A protein has these predicted regions:
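Aromatic-anchored segments of alpha-helical transmembrane domains
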Residues: 21-22, 89-95, 161-171, 225-231
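Membrane-embedded alpha-helical segments of multi-pass membrane proteins
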Residues: 56-64, 133-141, 182-186
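N-terminal transmembrane-helix/juxtamembrane module of multi-pass inner/ER membrane proteins
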Residues: 1-64, 108-109, 118, 262-274
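PTP/DSP superfamily signal
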Residues: 199-294, 364-372, 437-441, 452-507
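Interfacial helix-loop-helix junctions of multi-pass membrane proteins
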Residues: 130, 165-191
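Intrinsic disorder/low-complexity segments
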Residues: 368-438
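Cysteine-based protein phosphatase catalytic domain of the PTP/DSP
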Residues: 114-121, 295-372, 435-444, 459-501
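Membrane-interface loops
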Residues: 28-46, 71-166, 190-194, 202, ...
Length: 507
C-alpha cells in the first residue's frame, strides 16, 4: 500500500523536530551544568542595537523550516531535505558539546506580540548553544531550499532579503554574538557541500597514491599554519586576524580533496560552475589558485596550436575558443565557448586511468562535432611524412575505416616525435589549408595548460590516433614548452590504448 505524501511529510517533520528539540535541549543542559562557560565577543558588539521587532523574522525560520517538508516534491527531495537538516543538527551538537559558549547579555523588557515571542523562546531556550549558530546554519540550509524552489527573479530577491534578515536577527535579538555568525555560515555551507539537494552527495574515495598524500599533507600543514596565525594575530595584534581562519578552512578542505574526496570537493558541475557553497568555503584558496596561475603564465603564451584547430593551454584563454575541454577543478568556466565539456581534475597529480579514458572520449566527441570529424587534423600531421610501427599504423587504419563507414572519410594519423624546422613549415602550410576549410578551434585546458590537459591530449593522440607515447609526447613538447607529465602516465595511457585496440577488433 502506498503511503500518502502528506503523511510521509508529516511523519518526517515529527521525527526531525523531535531530534532537534531533544539534542538542542540536551546540549543546553550539559552546558548549564558546567561551572564556567566562556563567552566570546568583540568590544564593538556593545554598540549593536536591540530591535524587539526582529524577533519576528527570527521566529519565522521555525515556520519556514517546517513548511519545507510539505513543499518537497517526491520522496527523494524529502530525503535530501531531511538529511541536510540532520547533518546540520549533528554538526552543531558536536560543537556545542566540545566548545560550549554563552550569551550573557540581558535583554531589555519587551511587551506586546514581540514580548510574547521572546517569552515563548525563553520557555525552552537557555543562553548557551552559541557557536556555530544553529539558527544561522539552518538559515543557510532552509534558505537554499527555498531559493532553489523560487523561479521568478523578484521572488528570489525577496527570499534572499528575508533570510538575510533572519541571519541578522540573531544579533539584534541578543541571541548570539558575532563570532557565531561566520561559523554558522561556514557550517551551513559545509552541509550543502556534503549533502547537496542536486547531484551526488560528497563521498570518500581512497586512492593509494603517494603524490596525493604529499599534497594533502602540504595543504593540511598550511591549514594549521594559517589557523595558528589567526589565533596569534588576534591575541597580539587585532581581532580581524581571525579571518585567517577562513583561509585555514579552505586549505583544510583542499587537503581533504587530495586525501579522500577528490576533485568533487570543488563541486564543479557539467556547466563548469562551482556550487555556491563550495565557492564560499574555498574562496581564499580559489584566489590563491588564480594568483598562482597568473604568476606562472606571466610573459608566456596562454595557448598553443598542437594540430590545426586543436589547442593546448590555460583555462584563462578558454573564452576565445569554439569548444573547450576543461580539466581544471579549481577554475570556473569562462564565457565564450559554445561547446563545453567539464572534466574536473586535481592539480599536481597524475590523472587516473578512468579520467584519461573519459577525457580522451570527450575530446574525440569535441573534435568530431567541432572540427568536422577531425580530417584536417589528421591530414596535416600525415604530411610530416613520419613512420610508425606496423601495430600503430594498423590500429589507426582500423579506426579510420570505422569512421569512414559512420561519418565519412578520415585520414591516417602519422607523425614523428620531434619535428625539425622543415616539418614545422610543412605543418604551418597544412594549417593554412585547414583554416580555409574550417576556422573553428578546440581548446584542451587546465590552469596552466602544462599538466592535466596535456595528459588528456596525450591520451587522445595515443588512444584515438594510434601514435606511440613517445611520439605523442614529443609532438606536444615541440608545440608547447613547459609540458610536465609524470612518468607513470606512460603505463596508464599505453594500457588504455591496448584495451582500445582489443575493443576495436572485437567490434
Amino acid at each position: 500500500m502506498k503511503t500518502k505524501p502528506f503523511l510521509l511529510q508529516l511523519a518526517a517533520l515529527v521525527v526531525v523536530a523531535a531530534i532537534f528539540y531533544a539534542s538542542y535541549g540536551a546540549t543546553n543542559t550539559l552546558a548549564s551544568a558546567r561551572a564556567n562557560v566562556p563567552e566570546i565577543y568583540f568590544a564593538w558588539e556593545r554598540a549593536l542595537p536591540f530591535w524587539a521587532w526582529s524577533i519576528v523574522p527570527y521566529w519565522s525560520l521555525n515556520l519556514l523550516y517546517a513548511l519545507g517538508f510539505f513543499l518537497c516534491k517526491g520522496a527523494r527531495e524529502l530525503a535530501r531535505y531531511v538529511t541536510q537538516l540532520l547533518v546540520a543538527q549533528m554538526i552543531a551538537t558536536l560543537f556545542f558539546i566540545a566548545f560550549p559558549l554563552q550569551m550573557s547579555w540581558e535583554k531589555p523588557a519587551v511587551s506586546g506580540f514581540s514580548g510574547f515571542l521572546f517569552s515563548s523562546l525563553a520557555a525552552f531556550d537557555l543562553p548557551f548553544n552559541q557557536a556555530p549558530s544553529l539558527h544561522v546554519i539552518l538559515c543557510v540550509v532552509v534558505g537554499a531550499f527555498y531559493l532553489r524552489k523560487a523561479r521568478a527573479v523578484w521572488l528570489k530577491a525577496a527570499l534572499a532579503a528575508w533570510f538575510a534578515l533572519i541571519g541578522l536577527s540573531v544579533l539584534t535579538t541578543y541571541q548570539h554574538h558575532f563570532i557565531d555568525i561566520p561559523t554558522g555560515l561556514a557550517a551551513g555551507c559545509f552541509v550543502l557541500l556534503v549533502r547537496p539537494m542536486d547531484g551526488a552527495p560528497l563521498s570518500f574515495a581512497i586512492v593509494r597514491e603517494a603524490a596525493r598524500y604529499k599534497w594533502a599533507a602540504l595543504y593540511l600543514g598550511l591549514a594549521f599554519l594559517t589557523l595558528f596565525a589567526a589565533i596569534l594575530g588576534a591575541k597580539i595584534w587585532n581581532s580581524w586576524a581571525l579571518w585567517l581562519s577562513w583561509v585555514s578552512l579552505s586549505f583544510a578542505l583542499v587537503a581533504c580533496g587530495y586525501a579522500f574526496l577528490g576533485a568533487r570537493v570543488f563541486a564543479k558541475n557539467e556547466r563548469g560552475k562551482h556550487a555556491a557553497a563550495a565557492k564560499a568555503l574555498l574562496f581564499p584558496y580559489l584566489c590563491v589558485a588564480r594568483l598562482n596561475a597568473s604568476f606562472w603564465l606571466r610573459g608566456r603564451r596562454l595557448a598553443d596550436e598542437i594540430l590545426p584547430g586543436l589547442y593546448l593551454g590555460s583555462v584563462k584563454e578558454a573564452g576565445k575558443f569554439d569548444a573547450v575541454l576543461d580539466c581544471a577543478a579549481e577554475f570556473e568556466r569562462p564565457g565564450g565557448a559554445q561547446i563545453y565539456a567539464s572534466l574536473p581534475m586535481l592539480d599536481m597529480i597524475t590523472p587516473g586511468a578512468d579520467e584519461l579514458r573519459h577525457g580522451a572520449d570527450e575530446l574525440e566527441r569535441l573534435v568530431k562535432t567541432t572540427l568536422g570529424g577531425g580530417e584536417n587534423l589528421l591530414q596535416s600531421v600525415a604530411k610530416l611524412g613520419s613512420n610508425f610501427s606496423a601495430e600503430a599504423n594498423g590500429y589507426a587504419n582500423e579506426r579510420n575505416l570505422k569512421f569512414h563507414r559512420q561519418a565519412g572519410s578520415r585520414a591516417n594519423l602519422q607523425t614523428r616525435g620531434t619535428a625539425n624546422e622543415g616539418e614545422k613549415q610543412t605543418l604551418a602550410n597544412s594549417n593554412e589549408q585547414a583554416a580555409e576549410v574550417n576556422d573553428k578551434k578546440v581548446l584542451v585546458c587546465c590552469a596552466l595548460g602544462y599538466g592535466r590537459s596535456a595528459s588528456v591530449l596525450l591520451a587522445w593522440l595515443v588512444i584515438y590516433g594510434g601514435l606511440g607515447f613517445d611520439e605523442a609526447l614529443d609532438l606536444l613538447k615541440s608545440r608547447r614548452e613547459k609540458i610536465a607529465v609524470a612518468s607513470s602516465l606512460r603505463e596508464r595511457i599505453t594500457r588504455l590504448a591496448a584495451e582500445a585496440r582489443v575493443n576495436s577488433k572485437a567490434e
